């Protein structure tokens, strides 16, 4: 059994947490996030700690408590420090350009791709082949990065495509005659 739910979430200075029924709102210097808590889980605040516990000992309750604790921890970390994902475009003519609330991608197709950046995410392009996504919602930052990567996943023969900075692409050898 995992013991994740038993560890409290430490709330840093500058972050305020509001509990109202099954809803939790976390405000910090970077932004504000809110979430509805599962009905099997009860969340309480003691000084600068958030404690998750179960309502009744039913199957899967501790699993939900552990998930809730991890989600709250990500919310607290997101509004205090923020999250960041970096993507690299590798291939001849592959380019990216941030234009307001959209990202213009040239990925070898016959047409350019305009990807809309969701609210709460900032997109920067330090160079034509690098994309940096920042935000306070870990799920939204990761999902946006995954959506951009899905346009042209890295292929195993030449390694062309959109990849994460720390991603390792297994290479294959070309067919021999």
Curated annotation (Swiss-Prot):
One GO BP: cytoplasmic translation
PROSITE patterns given in the database record: RIBOSOMAL_L6_1
Entry keywords, A to Z: Ribonucleoprotein, Ribosomal protein, RNA-binding, rRNA-binding
GO cellular component, one term: cytosolic large ribosomal subunit
Keyword Ribonucleoprotein listed: yes
Highest taxon listed in the record's lineage: Bacteria
Keyword set includes DNA-binding: no
A Pfam family this chain is assigned to: Ribosomal_L6
Paired cysteines (S-S): none
Gene Ontology molecular functions: rRNA binding; structural constituent of ribosome
Assigned protein family: Belongs to the universal ribosomal protein uL6 family.
Subunit-structure text: Part of the 50S ribosomal subunit.
Function: This protein binds to the 23S rRNA, and is important in its secondary structure. It is located near the subunit interface in the base of the L7/L12 stalk, and near the tRNA binding site of the peptidyltransferase center.
Name this polypeptide is given: Large ribosomal subunit protein uL6
Organism of provenance: Colwellia psychrerythraea (strain 34H / ATCC BAA-681)
């Amino acid at each position: 059994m995992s013991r994740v739910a038993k560890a409290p979430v430490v709330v840093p200075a500058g972050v305020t947490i509001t509990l109202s029924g099954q809803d939790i709102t976390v405000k910090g210097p970077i932004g504000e996030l809110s979430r509805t808590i599962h009905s099997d889980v009860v969340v309480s605040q003691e000084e600068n700690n958030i404690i998750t516990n179960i309502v009744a000992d039913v199957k899967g309750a501790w699993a939900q408590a552990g998930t809730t604790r991890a989600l709250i921890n990500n919310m607290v970390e997101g509004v205090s420090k923020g999250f960041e994902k970096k993507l690299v475009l590798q291939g001849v003519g592959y380019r990216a350009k941030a234009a307001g609330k959209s990202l213009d991608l040239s990925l070898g197709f016959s047409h350019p791709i305009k990807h809309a950046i969701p609210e709460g995410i900032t997109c920067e392009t330090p160079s034509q082949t690098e994309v940096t996504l920042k935000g306070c919602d870990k799920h939204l930052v990761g999902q946006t990065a995954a959506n951009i990567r899905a346009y042209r996943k890295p292929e195993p023969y030449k390694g062309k495509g959109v990849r994460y900075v720390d991603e390792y692409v297994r290479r294959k050898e070309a067919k021999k005659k």
